[in-house]
Amino acid sequence: NNFLQKKILNSYDNFRPDLVVMGHADKVTSLTLEKMKNFDKNLKISQWFLDPLSRHGPDHLNNTNRILDKIEFIDNTFLTTDPKALNIKMPNSLFIPNPCDPSFEILENFKKECSFDVFFAMSHGVHRGSLKRGKKDDREIFINNFIKKNKKIKFDVYGMNKVQPIWGDQFMKKISNSYMGLNLSRGKPIKYYSSDRIAQLIGNGLLTLIDHKTYLKDFFTDKELVFYNNLDDLSYKINKFNKDRYLGKKIAEAGQKKYLKYFNSTVVSDFMISRIFDIKSKNKFIWNKD
């Protein structure tokens, strides 16, 4: 680990940046950040964190320790959960949406006839290539009940029931075959949190269904996303839009248009920089009320 810290400090010394941004950089030590700050008192250090932080979610203690580990040297923290909904207090913490990128989100599923009705994918850890034996996830119970209730719906499901998770190009190939996508994250819903799957579902033009308890209605209307209250409501809406494909595709197209316009990586990065350096931006940040 000393070798890594030296490499980081050498890179810092070579470039002397005004800003260092870390994302899930667990191996960087507080001492390394302290040394950087000692080199340059005006240096800004920020972190972003995309994992769940709710006390009702998975890995709560571990994720909390990770985000607070170097907090004394962090000027700003950007989270994909509303900081006000958390029981962790972090100075200068702000919400950011999961960014999309038009060079990655390239599909327009609303323009075609898909062979599957509903897509859902999960895993037992970020980019973990295979299922963990004996590992259970609450989502499996929900999805299996959902499938049982809707025998006429064609599901394409990965990461459970002995079907391995999918990543990268394989993920894109599979997602291209579905009309609707279920966005269901681990743990109980919490304000604004979603895994980054939301960007892939909406951004690729799937009609996306999400729990209303995420409060994403603050940014999207019923003409852009489909919000459900419980399993029965989700079943009703899946069947409704499975029959009314014209309306479903219009909603999917409007959702993609908004996500690519307001939640793209350029706009999200600009928001971060504008808040870090207190600079006014010409962009509209629909998720920020300040």
Label for each model-derived stretch:
Residues 3-7, 11-15, 23-31, 56-58, ...:
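Nucleotide-sugar donor-binding catalytic core of glycosyltransferases
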Residues 225-231, 240-245:
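Conserved acidic donor-binding segment of nucleotide-sugar-dependent glycosyltransferases
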Residues 234:
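Catalytic phosphate/metal-binding cores of nucleic-acid and nucleotide-processing enzymes, i.e., regions
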Residues 237-290:
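C-terminal amphipathic helix plus adjacent low-complexity
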